């Protein structure tokens, strides 16, 4: 017997080059994590294109996740790979995925992470989300970083797996 739901999907990995040479300045004001998609590890050949109509999941021009080719009910797994460069002890960092109009849906990737020492810290977070409305689907989603003390951030890349329902 067959189940009522069928799933298909694919993935892409967008690697950044620009922030390696010019890290993102992080302050108390939420700042978008940028990714030019020009890194040697960028790989979009496994996007679920054939018959599924998904052409991209990351928009390098707007620096945001583009879910417009997905349907309400589709699912995504996102892996964020960054390094934060902490210049002052006891720096607290947050990274949130803001989705929907005005960032009305907030998915925390890093919440109140206190870096007690200075230095460079690699941070990898993996989060599963779903497209719960047309607003979430049709509005560019962004990862935004902020900190209570000035620091910098290098984006290594974003891996995104799309799972289509139906």
Task: Please identify what each model-predicted range represents.
Residues 1-166:
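Extracellular jelly-roll beta-sandwich "head" domains, especially the C-terminal globular C1q domain
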